[in-house]
Amino acid sequence: MADEINEIREEQEQLAPFDPSKKKKKKKVVIQEPVEDLAESSQTEKSDSLPVNDGLESSFTGMKKKKKKPTESSLLNNESVDAGEDLDEIANDEQEGEEGIVLQQRYPWEGSERDYIYDELLGRVFNILRENNPELAGDRRRTVMRPPQVLREGTKKTVFVNFMDLCKTMHRQPDHVMQYLLAELGTSGSLDGQQRLVVKGRFAPKNFEGILRRYITDYVICLGCKSPDTILSKENRLFFLRCEKCGSQRSVAPIKTGFVARVSRRKT
């Protein structure tokens, strides 16, 4: 009977009106941690509170610190830098050496306070001439003249065989050369059919050679550069000698004939 009464009461309580003011109380659940977990948590809190350096020193008090070896990249960079500096120094030394050699060859007085020597200054002038005008400063071309070939024709005439060849070598007109020869020899002559100069009188080859030397000096050679490449022209009754190399121009004296004895008989 008592059990039935209790069941009825419980049903009545369940069917009772809902009261929102009343709240159910939550039961507090207490979890007990083991002792080992508590010790570990306390150690972590202490380690967090300590600075990093102190923790490392306290943990590794009995051990020595090892020095770190330099990496291979740093070594390679240092070697490349040293090699580059060495190459730059070698290149600079070579350039300085070459410049010093060139200056020493051109100007021996560089780097000293001594007086100039005439031979050194003269060599410098010729070096400048060779650089600017290699034709003028080069070796002079010597004009080689063939010796005159002279033959006797009879007892009163002399034949100049290679007269035309010498005129071509000197680049002069045969009439002008013949006029000078006859004026210097003091005789008369003419060209024959073989283009040989036939002169009246007896003359040795030395006579023709000396006259030709004077003709070359007066009417062929340039007095400035001593070049035989000249042109003889006539302007306003005057002869001018112009050099094709240096461009200088000068007037030359006209050919003067001396006294010529009249050998032919006068007509009566």
From Swiss-Prot:
The modification N-acetylalanine is found at A2. Eukaryotic translation initiation factor 2 eIF2 is a heterotrimeric complex composed of an alpha, a beta and a gamma subunit. The gene is EIF2B. Phosphorylated at Ser-42, Ser-80 and Ser-112 by CK2. One of its GO terms (molecular function) is zinc ion binding. This is Eukaryotic translation initiation factor 2 subunit beta. One of its GO terms (cellular component) is plastid. The keyword ATP-binding does not apply. Component of the eIF2 complex that functions in the early steps of protein synthesis by forming a ternary complex with GTP and initiator tRNA. This complex binds to a 40S ribosomal subunit, followed by mRNA binding to form a 43S pre-initiation complex (43S PIC). Junction of the 60S ribosomal subunit to form the 80S initiation complex is preceded by hydrolysis of the GTP bound to eIF2 and release of an eIF2-GDP binary complex. In order for eIF2 to recycle and catalyze another round of initiation, the GDP bound to eIF2 must exchange with GTP by way of a reaction catalyzed by eIF2B. The modification Phosphoserine is found at S42, S80, S112. Pfam families: eIF-5_eIF-2B. Residues 1-12 have a biased composition (Basic and acidic residues). Coiled coil: none annotated. The lineage of its organism: Eukaryota, Viridiplantae, Streptophyta, Embryophyta, Tracheophyta. InterPro entries: IF2/IF5, Transl_init_fac_IF2/IF5_dom, Transl_init_fac_IF2/IF5_N, Transl_init_fac_IF2/IF5_Zn-bd. The keyword Zinc-finger applies. A zinc finger (C4-type) spans 222-246. Its main location: cytoplasm. One of its GO terms (biological process) is cytoplasmic translational initiation. Residues 1-85 are annotated as: Disordered. It is found in: Cytoplasm, Cytosol.
